[in-house]
Amino acid sequence: MVSVKAYYNETVETVRRDLNGEQDFLTNEEVKRRQEKFGFNELAEGKKKSGLQIFLEQYKDFLVLILIVSAVVSLFLGETESAAVILVVITMNAILGTVQTIKAENSLESLKQLAAPEAKVVRNGAVVRIPGREITVGDVVHLEAGDYIPADGRVLESASLKVDESALTGESIGVDKISAPLTGELPLGDRRNMVFSGSYVTYGRGVFLVTGIGMNTEVGKIAGLLKNTSEKKTPLQINLDRFGKKLSMIILLLCAVLFALQVLKGGAVADAFLFAVALAVAAIPEALSSIVTIVLAFGTRKMAKEGAIIRKLQSVEGLGSVSVICSDKTGTLTQNRMTIEHYYVDGRDIPADQIDPANPLQEQMLKFSILCNDSTNVEGQEIGDPTETAMVNLGDKKGISAQEVRDACPRSSEVPFDSDRKLMSTFHKMKDGYTMITKGAVDVMLKRVDYIQKGGKIFPVTEVDVENICRVNEQYSESGLRVLGIGYRHFPVEKNISTEDEQRLVFLGLLAMMDPPRTESAAAVSDCKRAGICPVMITGDHKVTAAAIAKRIGILDDISQACEGVQIDGMSDEELNEFVENIRVYARVTPEHKIRIVRAWQERGNIVAMTGDGVNDALALKQADVGVAMGITGTEVAKDAASMILTDDNFATIIKAVESGRNIYENIKKAIQFLLSGNFAAILVVIAASLMNLPVPFAPVHLLFINLLTDSLPAIALGLEPYHHDVMGKKPRPVKESILTKEFLIRVGVEGGVIGAVVLTAFLIGYRDGNEVLAGTMAFAVLCLSRLLHGYNCKAGKPVIFTGEFFDNRFMQGAFLSGFVLLTAVLAVPVLHGFFAVQTLKIGELLAVYGLSGVSMLVIQGLKRMVKF
């Protein structure tokens, strides 16, 4: 069998014979045999992790391993209750993490369009419609305008067949397909006698023979490469990994020092171990991973409502770190809808919004552009070449119905457009006779024009007329507009027109069109720059068109900031790393160029977001720190490679997502500050008790109760703090910036010190008579209540008490009330006293607990008033 790569070099007869022998179609029996051999026409699914694998991965964290060791030590020392509580806590966290991960994966599955589009194939000699997945090698498939191509294949017949291959090649202009063999080794975009899976028929009809299905298509090859690409860690994952390792080392060091001190002071080894276990449990924020997961999950829900679906939870925060956004042009920054912007009629430039159907010449332009046009509108879906749909849409806006115009002036013959002639002509019966209407490239048309229409009269065309037309055409083109000329010729009788009739034309006017920017793009780009993010346009379109759009929306200041892909080809990686700093628009780029551009920005220390919709974008989406796929125009391969999907294909949605990402990171920092300062307070109390030869102030169950119940709720509430728009007025944080900055550690130390002081005071008050249970109960209660109140301290770097901010988070109010009720239940319900190692407190002792807890909050709020930290 001839290799797939060579099919475009072979004749139709050779390919037919090679794939199907003497048959012109496949029988049902042959289809079944081939499906057993080649499989179905679908992309292979990656191997999924089982629920057990996901569950076990939750135990990889350093902090979790320390807790497991603590549980084993407790069990060895006979502290079975403490060991059981620690293990239950670890298991609960693992279950929560597993559930959230599986939920995210299930959400992704619901996004995938599992049903391939149907296709018309010849089976047993008859044309039948079947699901795309049932197509096999050797099938003969019929195509018409509006069809998606379900597999790769060799064109057998082409009736003006034009295919949009932008999803695969990035080329925005449709490709005219032929059936003749080609010579030499050609790149994908030049194989004009081949069609490819995922492409779209915009014009004409055709028939092709399937040569590749599933993973053997061009789409499948890219999907296969993606499966071999490793996942990149997001900045938050890297930060939390570093944070966990640093904290683990600090905790282990403190435990070792405390154990050694206890032994050196003559304490029993078992007691020394209990102190060390208490310290480990006090220091480790057990619920941190679950809290981060919950906060990110809430963030994804909020972002989904705004049009951004997050495939990978950690990418939510990753967006907040982005410093460069490499965006596609078509459909993301623009409307993905060709629109008429100007007419040139009767020697005048007329902006589209000023076109008047009451003007005879302008009405004639509107109607002629609709007649010499093959686009249709079926149930609201536009089918046809985008330039032609733009003409019909303008007529519709001006109150001219395409159907009524076509019914009034029926077409009797045509000369279809082809890329060599660059013209299209149609022949119509008019009220006053017969007219051939021609539209096409201006330079080609002017060579065939003998006359020009001015003020309702026809005159011989002059050199001055031609110069004026060429000047306007050049002005339009330099503004990034696509320009077509409209001309016509009257005939006395009906005839079947040919290319020979495309002469002695009357020039009517010019149509200038473009895919205009989205109305919100300019504001989004401005927000992007204000946030310290560099917006870059990367497109397969022409440089002039791309630069015109980029200038309109504020990405480009000067044409010197635009380049074409060929300029990159001759550069080394080092040269490109320097080059990207000054370039804002890349035109006529290939998938390889996109990957190199992304890498160059990353080499300069940037976090890069990359948008894309085509199969050809998939590898660049994977290479980027945050890959953003288009939900409307995006291919499934692009969506699978991305970490975020835009349901509205809108650049402005990315900026909203960046704002959400930054707010989420700030809120996670607040939650971590809250957890660490509370845990630091407990550490200080344990160390102070050891140095003062006092008993261990807390049972492990006390600390686990606080860390998991009364601490988790405020921490989650802090993670769900209202978003603040001022985050977009700051530059992206440095890639290597740690959560544990100097300022952050000072806040944790000061706040933890204040809380630790009041807790130690409570312990000493309770221990006046040597009652260890009373002392432990008071210390536990003050630590618990102080940390509940401390949630309000962590809301902002300034005082919030007696301000509206104190009450602006309903989750915080709920967290405080829930925690207070749980603490009250532990202290007031006798049946719980034994398990939690507490006793009932008298009124005076309760007042001391409430007073000391309140003091901790007031002191920290006072410090915030004096020094913002």
Where are each of the predicted segments found?
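Membrane-water interface at loop-to-transmembrane-helix junctions
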Residues: P734-G753, V773-T777
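Alpha-helix capping/termination and helix-coil
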Residues: N373, G605, V658, R662, ...
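Helix-coil boundary and interhelical linker segments in multi-pass alpha-helical membrane proteins
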Residues: S690-A699, F763-A775
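Generic alpha-helical transmembrane segments
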Residues: T710, I755, T777-G791
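Conserved cytosolic headpiece of P-type ATPases
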Residues: M1-G729, I739-L740, G753, F780, ...
